[in-house]
């Protein structure tokens, strides 16, 4: 919200900064002002086109990066996520050290995050979103967007682990024990902090029991009891 209050003020400043000399092409101020008018009217597609035009026609203007930020955000608001990603790619290519780089990485993550779908489908967008948010956290840990990114990272890790668990349960129903074990172990090893880990440990005890390996089954049962003594999946062990 703070960014766009600043940009709103910028639009008014730009609208009033034209000099007496009029260039043959439209100035950054004129295009930007029209773009912001469309944005405020909710015509995000037209706004995005104009913001993109402003940046493309005046790439060396001091406000070109801001126009590109607004082009990306307008595409995002129009649910044109592929268009928003193209704009953010251009921003990071030409302005990687700009003060708005953390926001652009966050916006990239949100473009993928908004497309995350049913837990029964392939990870796809959730993996891409996670990569963007983790990059933001790593590159700009003190950014105001890093905290929001951290929340999204936790949600996405649980979501992705949920997808793996769904697939592992399906394998177990089909008695495809090797595949199920591989997937369950991946949850335990790479997503240990998620809420899916206790169930993954419990399912591993079932899988190893099913293939006649009681020692391995007992090992995972002990791990479950030690790390999650009061969890519902731990209580199932003794039933």
Describe the function of each predicted region:
Residues 9-14:
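Hydrophobic core
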Residues 2-8:
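Sec-dependent signal peptide recognition
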Residues 5, 16-239:
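Acidic, polar-rich low-complexity tracts and alpha-helical solenoid repeat scaffolds
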